[in-house]
């Protein structure tokens, strides 16, 4: 589905008329059930549940969030390519601009309040940003495996990604190969591959075959321009300067962190929680224990469902 934002002024001062915003709704129609907004991550999209759903293990009848009892809404981040449109420039928006657009999208749909906003990775940062801009919008927010501000380590990785995109002869494939190393951990890869050789007889290592597979797979389903946009947006995460400023958010805040995350590190999530909880009692901290690093939010579904489910009760 698509709506049009009549007028939008980006933080760089550019004014857009009739800006298209695409989205999907699952479950009961808007206005008839508690509404959950799901913000997608870097290579994600609005298909969060159902036949093409990339988060079905969490958002389904078998998962923690039931689309039978909750209306599920997800927008596409402009430029992610899922609507078939290519972005002319990677740097035209910041993540704050995306949050502003999503809020205008909610206004267009007549949405005054949300039961919850949930998102992981960049989608989690977007969750922080939306709640910061409209502190009373949601009853609950669940930012997963993310940060309210880009760390120097994250900025290091996004610069490497941009350099690969600019200089590689096979930019999308090579950028994805590097990104996979950020999304996993040494312990995860060592345990899985044990320095074994690939099964294809090429003589290469199994881990090399696996990395190339992920690079090739993304090339088939993702636009190079979209990857550039999403990488740029990741580097613009900056809700506020200090965590204490997040106390303006009235929602119950459930921070979910992964103890082995190399991209959005566990210690920073803990520091954010500690800065908040002394001023805001309805702040809670949950840990996913895993050797798999950042991608654990897409792998450790038993733990994630156990963490999230209590806040999404379904009537008997």
Where are these regions (language model features)?
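Catalytic-loop region of hydrolases
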Residues: 1-35
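N-terminal cap/lid subdomain of alpha/beta-hydrolase-fold enzymes
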Residues: 24-82
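Conserved acidic catalytic loop of the alpha/beta-hydrolase fold
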Residues: 96-115
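Conserved hydrolase catalytic core segment
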Residues: 113-152
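Alpha/beta-hydrolase-fold enzymes
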Residues: 137-217
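Short beta-strand/loop motif that positions the catalytic acidic residue
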Residues: 249, 255-257
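Conserved alpha/beta-hydrolase "acid-adjacent" motif
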Residues: 262-271
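Catalytic active-site module of serine/aspartate enzymes centered on a nucleophile-bearing elbow/loop
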Residues: 270-316
């Amino acid at each position: 589905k698509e709506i049009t934002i009549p007028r939008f002024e980006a933080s760089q001062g550019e004014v857009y008329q009739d800006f298209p915003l695409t989205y999907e709704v699952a479950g009961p129609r808007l206005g008839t059930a508690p509404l959950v907004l799901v913000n997608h991550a870097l290579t994600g999209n609005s298909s969060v549940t159902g036949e093409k759903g990339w988060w079905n293990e969490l958002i389904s009848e078998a998962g923690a969030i039931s689309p039978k009892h909750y209306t599920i809404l997800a927008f596409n981040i402009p430029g992610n390519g899922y609507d078939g449109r290519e972005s002319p420039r990677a740097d035209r928006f910041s993540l704050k601009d995306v949050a502003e657009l999503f809020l205008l999208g909610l206004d267009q749909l007549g949405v005054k309040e949300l039961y919850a906003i949930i998102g992981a990775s960049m989608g989690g940062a977007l969750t922080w940003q939306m709640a910061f801009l409209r502190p009373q919008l949601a009853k609950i927010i669940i930012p997963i495996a993310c940060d309210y501000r880009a760390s120097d380590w994250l900025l290091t990785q996004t610069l490497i990604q941009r350099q690969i995109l600019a200089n590689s002869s096979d930019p999308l494939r090579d950028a994805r190969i590097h990104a996979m190393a950020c999304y996993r951990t040494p312990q995860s890869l060592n345990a899985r591959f044990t320095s074994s050789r690939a099964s294809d007889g090429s003589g290469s290592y199994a881990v090399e075959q696996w990395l190339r597979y992920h690079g090739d797979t993304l090339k088939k389903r993702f636009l190079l321009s979209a990857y550039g946009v999403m990488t740029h947006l990741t580097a613009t995460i900056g809700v506020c300067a200090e965590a204490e400023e997040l106390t303006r958010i009235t929602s119950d805040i459930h921070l979910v962190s992964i103890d082995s995350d190399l991209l959005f590190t566990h210690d920073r999530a803990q520091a954010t929680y500690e800065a908040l909880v002394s001023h805001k009692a309805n702040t809670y901290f949950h840990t996913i224990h895993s050797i798999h690093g950042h991608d654990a939010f897409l792998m450790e579904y038993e733990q994630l469902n156990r963490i999230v489910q209590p806040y999404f009760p379904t009537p008997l």
